[in-house]
Amino acid sequence: IESAYFRNKFEPELGRFIGSYLGIGVISDMESQPITVTSHLGRFAVVTVGRIDNLEEISAQLLKEKIHFAEMSGSAINPTEVVSILINKGETFKEGIENVYRMVKGSCSFLILTDSCIYAARDKFGRTPIIIGKNEFGYVVASESSSFTNLGYNIVRDLGPHEAIRVSKDGITPIIAAGCRKQICSFLWVYYGYPSAYYLSLIHI
């Protein structure tokens, strides 16, 4: 979904979800998402939320390495494509996520969808939240909890800064432990957060 807060109908797309129990999405004001990649890691899709302060620096380095960008947003490089390239530089998804943490300055939380699971990674300072929910049918991860009640999910917990998990039909598997450094942006929560959302499992905006 691009430049829209809601879509009230998804009928044309519903047939594409038959037989699948996994999915990701994002509302983006700027770039088109998700980005789909086929590489040595297999076929995967990526969505991101946040701001990459050193996007130009990373992009310039990748161009020196003769890597091209195809998912342009107008004349600008798509930040989500940059994240997908950094992920793809790892030998595993864990290494790829760690590469994003190492290279990106700013705030970038993201989800990776594969054929069998979803990886959820919160930015290294915890500025953009990722919250886990659960019901009798499975799990959900989102940037805020406001939709959980209407969909029948209970809040499990927030991911910590620099934390990454793997979500599959078998449950949740830790991938990267949470870091100790947290620099939350309460203004972001107040400005963008829905009134019924909870943050850190206890702050009600």
PLM feature spans:
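Conserved short alpha-helical segments that host acidic/polar catalytic motifs at enzyme active sites
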Residues: 1-161, 166-202
